[in-house]
Amino acid sequence: GACCDGDGRTTRAGGCGRDECDTYVRVCLKEYQAKVTPTGPCSYGYGATPVLGSNSFYLPPAGAAGDRARARSRTGGHQDPGLVVIPFQFAWPRSFTLIVEAWDWDNDTTPDEELLIERVSHAGMINPEDRWKSLHFSGHVAHLELQIRVRCDENYYSATCNKFCRPRNDFFGHYTCDQYGNKACMDGWMGKECKEAVCKQGCNLLHGGCTVPGECRCSYGWQGKFCDECVPYPGCVHGSCVEPWHCDCETNWGGLLCDKDLNYCGSHHPCVNGGTCINAEPDQYLCACPDGYLGKNCERAEHACASNPCANGGSCHEVLSGFECHCPSGWSGPTCALDIDECASNPCAAGGTCVDQVDGFECICPEQWVGATCQLDANECEGKPCLNAFSCKNLIGGYYCDCLPGWKGANCHININDCHGQCQHGGTCKDLVNGYQCVCPRGFGGRHCELEYYKCASSPCRRGGICEDLVDGFRCHCPRGLSGPLCEVDVDLWCEPNPCLNGARCYNLEDDYYCACPEDFGGKNCSVPRETCPGGACRVIDGCGFEAGSRAHGAAPSGVCGPHGHCVSLPGGNFSCICDSGFTGTYCHENIDDCMGQPCRNGGTCIDEVDSFACFCPSGWEGELCDINPNDCLPDPCHSRGRCYDLVNDFYCVCDDGWKDKTCHSREFQCDAYTCSNGGTCYDSGDTFRCACPPGWKGSTCTIAKNSSCVPNPCVNGGTCVGSGDSFSCICRDGWEGRTCTHNTNDCNPLPCYNGGICVDGVNWFRCECAPGFAGPDCRINIDECQSSPCAYGATCVDEINGYRCSCPPGRSGPRCQEVVIFTRPCWSRGVSFPHGSSWVEDCNSCRCLDGHRDCSKVWCGWKPCLLSPQPSALSAQCPPGQQCREKAMGQCLQPPCENWGECTAEDPLPPSTPCLPRTTHLDNNCARLTLHFNRDQVPQGTTVGAICSGIRALPATRAAARDRLLLLLCDRASSGASAVEVAVSFSPARDLPDSSLIQSTAHAIVAAITQRGNSSLLLAVTEVKVETVVMGGSSTGLLVPVLCSVFSVLWLACMVICVWWTRKRRKERERSRLPRDESANNQWAPLNPIRNPIERPGSSGLGTGGHKDVLYQCKNFTPPPRRAGEALPGPASHGAGGEDEEDEELSRGDGRLSRSREVPLTQIHQRPQLLPGKASLLAPGPKVDNRAVRSTKDVRCAGRE
């Protein structure tokens, strides 16, 4: 058909007679209506086009028109005539109703209903996007096709165009916008509006903050890199603070500013010369001086010159402050002890070392140079530096040693080390030539020290206890206040009885006690149950991020529950969300799905809303549940030329005779251009018609959409698909966005977590995983680790980031101040304080401190050596007060040349007296003699006997033997040779020594230490050690007396019988025949000759029991001297039995004592005990010995060895 303007008629050809219609379009946009009403206001807006054409017209595609419109709007041009833009200033509701009307424009006609060409409507749903959506309408008169779309204005986003985001970088925010309108904070900014700067990592936000990223500006009263240090009270000297403007004093300090020293004595030790310091008042003290000293600090002696403080001949003058020394020429200093340095001009050449002397100097030259100033090259081989070598070859500026096999080093003094950790239990490996030897510590033995003999070797006694070795174990001698098998039990009166309750252990302190409480109790005596919040004033941060004392109990808004919930704090820092109606989930982030059960009927699409739902009905249905089919027969679509039947979204006309077509308006054809809608093809069947619908449509006239665009459902993650012909829209659930709901909304943008917390993004929720030490929903709260009172009683807890620090009171230590510092007393020695457990050396003795008691070895160190000088004043300056330097006996120099040494002696105290002296023959159970033989070539020049004796006294073995008794070691040149030194060893006092075992073990220990060669360079030259000790043997006449008595009794009876028999026989022979008398010797009586004991001495019988105990001198030679061939022992006869004669001779001398002498080679020591034979050996026949040759015991050192 054709649309004709005015009252024009159509021509026979079907066109308009006068003029066609001037068509333009009006558009009305209003809220969604299940049943569209064309009347009423256009609540969303309206628009109209200019005249677009006449009967039929076609406009360019909407996409090109839209692009052209945007281009013209930018250039200021006119809008495309076919484009209608309806702006709105509200959130797009997504559902809408669109009414489109085609009108005929005629200036000559008053507008009325007749001018309306066609009206169509569409109710549906559409999301904002750039794509166009096509709509097809087939009305009663006209057929319309148009495209629609909804676009958000610039800087508006989301499905409702109500999310505003405009990028900015100013005072009001620092962010950009993503494609979904989410604010993306720039680096260094956080918060909802990206206005909060990200402070420096670790910055304490309770005491500081920042205005620019990376900053940490402290609040008033706080300081430090992270604003975690409080500012102390101004002027606070020796104190600290936990809160600002406080001054908590350190130990021993007091006063408002902690500047008053409460223990001046302990901090400064002002008193000297043994004065006792007393704390009088803060910053004040008093010194109690010993006799002979005055002054505030006991620094001034009463008779300052009495001790002759001026050295080197200086004269002493007492002054008010003490003394002054007037020094002689060449000396200076307060005590005239500073010599003029003649070495200032560096007179020594060739790298020699200059030693300043009085009025001169001495050059100590390198080994390859000699002369007064080291200007001459020396023959290094003259000093025999090569120890284990074939020969020494002198070189220019040096020498070369041709070493023997097995040795190396410049002097062939290094033995190839065969020690590789074989010795156990701390044993010392001694390297030998092609071998090794383990020197075991006390208590261990075996080749590798693998056998334990001494139970105290592992030091089992604790806290200063002294271990005593027993046969079957050990015993600990505990210090005062300790007991138990290992001195581990404190028995001080503070803890007896135990004041600590609830199973706590008591520790004794110096003036108090300390209870180590279990976890559930606290207080002085562990009697107070430990509360979670001591005192009830808890400042625990609750799970919602608020302090419990800062708000009323109940629900509080918090970002953790989102915009649809309220946070409720639970015990233990937890929380719970109370959700608004229609929401559920841990964080109230899930909108309850009210579309469960599919309430919409007849294919309606259910749209979930907050606590409600809405049904989007397909064409042909309406109502809240899409259960109402509107009557499509209204108004009269059959034009009163037939009967109308209502269908779903359609109608059917049964036309009267002569009328055809869908609306009964034609008499010729069943089909026209508008019979089938939405592009359907009409087929005329004479009396009826049939529509072939395109894809996506169905129905008799293709008016029902199949909604095939939502099959399969393109919307994911629970999105609802709303189809409209060949297009669709997705209604996404909260937390999802995008055309098909594939993008999870980033709930972590902008950054919601503080203090380095990590944000975990969920679906419409987020969670902050806080860094260690922080808590709360957004990690802005520093956890107060001190709330649980982790520090022990009496300690102060200081909260820190991710931890705490306990400030301990005096006497306590440990991370929680739970460990007790055992108070011990120091030891004083020669004016020096030594703490408990420390060790030091005094002269030749070793000492250790045990709770105020000095435990020192008791070795008599001898007189102090001094250099003899022609000036008498210089002699006394080298010796302690009260002693004088006197010349020693001649012959003390072992390797000349030696300095002119003397010794400091005094009349009081006198050295201990002992009969055990070197170069004498005295030996008893408290006397041993050691004879040390030296290799003269290895002894350094200037070595004296006193130096060797000092080295032996300083041996650890010597000190260990002198723990309980005074040990005397006296040395002298031996008479046996020029390179031997004799050492006499004895204890003082000797009256309570039971036997000789102590002196023997001491001598053996000293010999073993000397053989190690590791203590002194002098002992490296020792080649042989000879040991002489005494063994007290038992009486040898115990079995001799009864045996001899039995023998003599038998002989006497036999003689009596024989005499009687022989007398009778002779008498009978005289009477019978009187034969001549036989005067020949009867040899059978030879065995009856009297037997004399060769060891009998006048006045003592071998058979008697009244004689004293036999004392046996054992002679042991480990390197025996050779005997000349044919050498015989003294006596009237020698039968060639040299061994027996020698033994008889030894037995015949003295009163039964046997001298035991051992010559010990340095490399190995053997002991071969030679006990006296039994009674049989004493009665054995042997050569007669001239008893006149026997000397007294005092003359015998070792028989046959002198």
Curated annotation (Swiss-Prot):
GO-annotated cellular components: membrane; perinuclear region of cytoplasm; plasma membrane
Q: Which PROSITE patterns match?
A: ASX_HYDROXYL (PS00010), DSL (PS51051), EGF_1 (PS00022), EGF_2 (PS01186), EGF_3 (PS50026), EGF_CA (PS01187)
Query: What GO terms are given for molecular function?
Result: calcium ion binding; growth factor activity; Notch binding
**Sorted alphabetically, which InterPro entries does this protein's record hold?**
DSL, EGF-like_Ca-bd_dom, EGF-like_CS, EGF-like_dom, EGF-type_Asp/Asn_hydroxyl_site, EGF_Ca-bd_CS, Growth_fac_rcpt_cys_sf, JAG1_1/2_dom
Q: Does the keyword NADP apply?
A: no
Q: Specify the EGF-like domain's residue ranges.
A: 195-228, 229-259, 261-299, 301-337, 339-375, 377-413, 415-450, 452-488, 490-527, 529-589, 591-627, 629-665, 667-703, 706-742, 744-780, 782-818
Spell out which residues lie on the membrane's Cytoplasmic side.
1059-1202
Q: Identify its membrane topology class.
A: Single-pass type I membrane protein
Pfam families attached to this UniProt entry? DSL, EGF, EGF_CA, EGF_DL_JAG, hEGF, JAG1, MNNL
Chain spans, region Disordered: 1070-1202
Primary residence: membrane
Which controlled-vocabulary keywords does the entry list?
Answer: Calcium, Developmental protein, Disulfide bond, EGF-like domain, Glycoprotein, Membrane, Notch signaling pathway, Phosphoprotein, Repeat, Transmembrane, Transmembrane helix
Q: Which cysteines are joined by disulfide bonds?
A: 152-161, 165-177, 185-194, 199-210, 203-216, 218-227, 230-241, 236-247, 249-258, 265-277, 271-287, 289-298, 305-316, 310-325, 327-336, 343-354, 348-363, 365-374, 381-392, 386-401, 403-412, 419-429, 423-438, 440-449, 456-467, 461-476, 478-487, 495-506, 500-515, 517-526, 544-567, 561-577, 579-588, 595-606, 600-615, 617-626, 633-644, 638-653, 655-664, 671-682, 676-691, 693-702, 710-721, 715-730, 732-741, 748-759, 753-768, 770-779, 786-797, 791-806, 808-817
Q: A Gene Ontology biological process annotation?
A: in utero embryonic development
Residues bearing PTM Phosphoserine: 1080
Membrane topology, Extracellular segments: 1-1037
Which residues does the annotation flag as glycosylated?
Answer: 107, 525, 574, 707, 1015
* Segments traversing the membrane: 1038-1058
Domain called DSL: residue spans = 150-194
Where is this chain's protein located in or outside the cell? Membrane
**What SUPFAM superfamilies has UniProt attached to this entry?**
EGF/Laminin, Growth factor receptor domain
Q: Where is the composition biased (Basic and acidic residues)?
A: 1070-1080, 1147-1159, 1185-1202
What PANTHER family does its record include? CYTOCHROME C OXIDASE POLYPEPTIDE VIC-2, DELTA-LIKE PROTEIN
Function text: Putative Notch ligand involved in the mediation of Notch signaling. May have a role in neurogenesis in the peripheral nervous system, limb development and in the adult brain.
* Protein name, UniProt field: Protein jagged-2
Species of origin reads Rattus norvegicus (Rat)
* Taxonomic lineage: Eukaryota, Metazoa, Chordata, Craniata, Vertebrata
